[in-house]
C-alpha cells in the first residue's frame, strides 16, 4: 500500500530534505532522502539508508564494539523525535513498555550493561534452574564420594547440602530480581552489601571456579568416551568438544540458552528414565541378579570406614562433592541482565528448585546406593584396576542390562558438555562483571554488537586449554585438583550470597524500607539464610580437618591439604591483599550506610498486588489444570 498523504518535511543530520509518511496498514514510519537517486520505486527504506550488506560482512561487523558514539546518539535521539512527530502515542508506548511491563514495575535506579541482549526467555530460565549442575559432580564425581562415604554417607551429605541449597536459592532469587539490572548478579552483591574486600576476594575465587570447571568438564568428557574406546588419543575428543563449546557461545546468550534448553531436556529425561529403570532392576524386573533391594547397604555396608571418625570424614568429604554437583543452580541470577522477563522467570525457577533437589538428586542417589556397592573397582577413586565409568552406567551395566548403558553414557556426555558450555558462558560474564566493578582491567568490559563479552570469552577459551592434559597419565590427578578448587569455591560463593541477603534485609529494616518494594520475597527469609550461612561455615571447618588428615590416615598430609583446600589460601590472599593495598580494615559496611537505591529495581507495591490479584482471578476463572500447574510450578 503506498502512502498518499502529504509528507512532513523535516531536516535530517545531513541537512537534506526528508520525507516522512505514516502508513495506514501497519502504522510504521517510512522515510527516505528526497532527491536521492537511490530512492526505490516500490519499497521505501526502513532507516536512513538500507545497505545490502552480505551475511559475511554483517557477521564480521557484529564483533565491533557495541558502544554508541556521540554522532550515533544524536541520530538515535532525532530518530525518536521523528517517531514522536508522526505518532505522539508511540513515545508513550515506549515509556509504558520500559517502565510498566510486568518484569519492570517500578523505578530503575541501577546500571547494567545495556549492550547485553535480552534473549533469554522464561522457558530457558526454568530449564537452566532445573538441569544446570547435572554434570560431572552428580554423574561422575559421585563415584569418588560413594567410595569414601558409602551409600548412607552419600545420601546424608546430599540431604544436608540440599536443605542448604534451597535456602540459598530463595535468597538468591529475591536479590536477583531486585538487582536484575546488575550484570553478574550475586557475584557483585558482597561488594556493596558486605564489604569491598570480601566482595573482591569472593568475586575472583568464583570466577576462578568457573574457569576451572570448563577444562574439568572437557577432561571428564574425554574420560566418558573411554567407556567406548581407549585406542583414540583423548585430546582428539577434547579438541572436538572445545570447538563445539566455543561455537555455541559465538552465538551469544541466545546460543547458550537454546543449547542449555536442549542439553537440560536430555538430562532430565535421562534421569527420569534411570529412576524408573533403577526401580525395576532393584526389584528384579530386569537384569540377571534378581531381587536386590538394600543388599549393598549390608554387604559391603552403609558406610565406608572401620571407625566412626572415618565414617564422619566420609560424610564431610561428600559435602564438597555435593556442593560441586549442586553448583550452577544460582545461574538464574547471572542471566538476569539477559532475561526478557525476570519477574516471572526467577520466582518460578526458585520455587521449582525443591523438585530438582528431591527428585533429580536425592531419589537417584538412593537408587545408586541400592545398585552399586561402594567397593566396586569401576568407580572413580577406587583402587581397583577396572575401567572407570559413571556410577549411573555401572548401576545398569553391572546387573546385565545391555544397550541402555550406552544411552546413559551418551546423555552423560551431553551433560558434561552442557556444564562446559555453562561454565564458559558464566566465566566470560564474570570477567565482564569484574571489569565493570574495577576489579579487573577495563579491556574485559568490551562487548560487541551481538552482545558478546568478546575479550572475556577469549580469556575463558585460553584457560580451557588446560583440558588438553587429558592425554597425560596424570589425568585423574588433574581432575581431582580442579574438582577440589571448584567445589570449595562454590561454598565460598554460597556463603557470600547468604551473608549478602542477611545484610540486605538488615539494611532494609534499619533504613525503614518496606519489603513491599521487593518483586519476590524469599520463602525461607532471614532465618533460612542464617541457617545456610552457619552450616557452610561448619562445613568449611570440617573440610579443613579432612584436608589436613585425610580419610584412613592419622598423619598430616600437605599434598592432600592443597588438593582439597587450595581455594581457601587463594581467598585469604586475595582478601588480605585488597585490604593492604587499599588500607581499608573495616569488616562490614554499616547497615545504615548501605546504598539501597543504586543498582536496585524498586517495585511499586500497589501495582504488584494488583498484578498478582489479576493473575489469581484469571486462575479462578480458568480451567482446573492451570490451577494445578500454578500450584506445583
Swiss-Prot record:
Assigned GO CC terms: plasma membrane
Topology feature Cytoplasmic, residues: 1-124, 170-197, 253-260, 335-352, 414-452, 499-531, 579-633
An example molecular function term from Gene Ontology annotations: amino acid transmembrane transporter activity
UniProt membrane topology term: Multi-pass membrane protein
Record topology, Extracellular segments: 146-148, 219-231, 282-313, 374-392, 474-477, 553-557
UniProt PTM comment: Palmitoylated by PFA4.
A Pfam family per the record: AA_permease
InterPro entries: AA-permease/SLC12A_dom, Amino_acid_permease_CS, Amino_acid_permease_fungi, APC_YAT
Spans through the membrane: 125-145, 149-169, 198-218, 232-252, 261-281, 314-334, 353-373, 393-413, 453-473, 478-498, 532-552, 558-578
Cross-link (Glycyl lysine isopeptide (Lys-Gly) (interchain with G-Cter in ubiquitin)): 11
Biased composition, class Basic and acidic residues, residue ranges: 92-101
Lipid attachment residues per UniProt (S-palmitoyl cysteine): 633
Metal-binding as UniProt keyword: no
Family: Belongs to the amino acid-polyamine-organocation (APC) superfamily. YAT (TC 2.A.3.10) family.
NCBIfam families cross-referenced by the UniProt entry: 2A0310
Protein name stated in the entry: General amino acid permease AGP1
Biological source species: Saccharomyces cerevisiae (strain YJM789)
Gene name as annotated: AGP1
Amino acid at each position: 500500500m503506498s502512502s498518499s498523504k502529504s509528507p512532513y518535511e523535516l531536516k535530517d543530520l545531513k541537512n537534506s530534505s526528508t520525507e516522512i509518511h505514516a502508513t495506514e496498514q501497519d502504522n510504521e514510519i517510512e522515510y527516505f532522502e528526497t532527491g536521492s537517486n537511490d530512492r526505490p520505486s516500490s519499497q521505501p527504506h526502513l532507516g536512513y539508508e538500507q545497505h545490502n550488506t552480505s551475511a559475511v560482512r554483517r557477521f564480521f561487523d557484529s564483533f565491533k564494539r557495541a558502544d554508541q558514539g556521540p554522532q550515533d546518539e544524536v541520530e538515535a535521539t532525532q530518530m525518536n523525535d521523528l517517531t514522536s512527530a508522526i505518532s505522539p502515542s508511540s513515545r508513550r508506548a515506549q515509556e509504558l513498555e520500559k517502565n510498566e511491563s510486568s518484569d519492570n514495575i517500578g523505578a530503575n535506579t541501577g546500571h547494567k550493561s545495556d549492550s547485553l541482549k535480552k534473549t533469554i526467555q522464561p522457558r530457558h530460565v526454568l530449564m537452566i534452574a532445573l538441569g544446570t549442575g547435572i554434570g560431572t559432580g552428580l554423574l561422575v564425581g559421585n563415584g569418588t564420594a560413594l567410595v569414601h562415604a558409602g551409600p548412607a554417607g552419600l545420601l546424608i551429605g546430599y540431604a544436608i547440602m540440599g536443605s542448604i541449597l534451597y535456602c540459598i536459592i530463595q535468597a538468591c532469587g529475591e536479590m536477583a530480581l531486585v538487582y536484575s539490572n546488575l550484570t553478574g548478579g550475586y557475584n557483585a552483591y558482597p561488594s556493596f552489601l558486605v564489604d569491598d574486600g570480601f566482595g573482591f576476594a569472593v568475586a575472583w575465587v568464583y570466577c576462578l571456579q568457573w574457569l576451572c570447571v570448563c577444562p574439568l568438564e572437557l577432561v571428564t568428557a574425554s574420560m566418558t568416551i573411554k567407556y567406548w574406546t581407549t585406542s583414540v588419543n583423548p585430546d582428539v575428543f577434547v579438541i572436538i568438544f572445545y570447538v563445539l563449546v566455543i561455537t555455541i557461545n559465538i552465538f551469544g546468550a541466545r546460543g547458550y540458552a537454546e543449547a542449555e534448553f536442549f542439553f537440560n531436556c536430555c538430562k532430565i529425561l535421562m534421569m527420569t528414565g534411570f529412576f524408573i529403570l533403577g526401580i525395576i532392576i532393584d526389584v528384579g524386573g530386569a537384569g540377571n541378579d534378581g531381587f536386590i533391594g538394600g543388599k549393598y547397604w549390608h554387604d559391603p555396608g552403609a558406610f565406608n570406614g572401620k571407625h566412626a571418625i572415618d565414617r564422619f570424614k566420609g560424610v564431610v568429604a561428600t559435602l564438597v562433592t555435593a556442593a560441586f554437583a549442586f553448583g550452577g543452580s544460582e545461574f538464574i541470577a547471572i542471566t538476569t541482565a539477559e532475561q526478557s522477563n525476570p519477574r516471572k522467570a526467577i520466582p518460578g525457577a526458585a520455587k521449582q528448585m525443591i523438585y530438582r533437589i528431591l527428585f533429580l538428586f536425592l531419589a537417584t542417589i538412593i537408587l545408586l546406593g541400592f545398585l552399586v556397592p561402594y567397593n566396586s573397582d569401576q568407580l572413580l577413586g577406587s583402587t581397583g584396576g577396572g575401567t572407570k565409568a559413571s556410577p549411573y552406567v555401572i548401576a545398569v551395566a553391572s546387573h546385565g542390562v545391555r544397550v541402555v548403558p550406552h544411552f546413559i553414557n551418551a546423555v552423560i556426555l551431553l551433560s558434561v558438555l552442557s556444564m562446559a558450555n555453562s561454565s564458559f558462558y558464566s566465566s566470560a560474564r564474570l570477567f565482564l562483571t569484574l571489569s565493570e566493578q574495577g576489579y579487573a582491567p577495563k579491556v574485559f568490559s568490551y562487548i560487541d554488537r551481538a552482545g558478546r563479552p568478546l575479550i572475556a570469552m577469549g580469556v575463558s577459551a585460553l584457560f580451557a586449554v588446560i583440558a588438553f592434559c587429558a592425554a597425560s597419565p596424570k589425568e585423574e590427578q588433574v581432575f581431582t585438583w580442579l574438582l577440589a578448587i571448584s567445589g570449595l569455591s562454590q561454598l565460598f560463593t554460597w556463603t557470600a550470597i547468604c551473608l549478602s541477603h542477611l545484610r540486605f534485609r538488615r539494611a532494609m529494616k534499619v533504613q525503614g524500607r518496606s519489603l513491599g518494594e521487593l518483586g519476590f520475597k524469599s520463602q525461607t527469609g532471614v532465618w533460612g539464610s542464617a541457617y545456610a550461612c552457619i552450616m557452610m561455615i561448619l562445613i568449611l571447618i570440617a573440610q579443613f580437618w579432612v584436608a589436613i588428615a585425610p580419610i584412613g590416615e592419622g598423619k598430616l598430609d600437605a599434598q592432600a591439604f592443597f588438593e582439597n583446600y587450595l581455594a581457601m589460601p587463594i581467598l585469604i590472599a586475595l582478601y588480605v591483599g585488597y585490604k593492604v593495598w587499599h588500607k581499608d580494615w573495616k569488616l562490614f559496611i554499616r547497615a545504615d550506610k548501605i546504598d539501597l537505591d543504586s543498582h536496585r529495581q524498586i517495585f511499586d507495591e500497589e501495582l504488584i498486588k494488583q498484578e498478582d490479584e489479576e493473575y489469581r482471578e484469571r486462575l479462578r476463572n480458568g480451567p482446573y489444570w492451570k490451577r494445578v500447574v500454578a500450584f506445583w510450578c
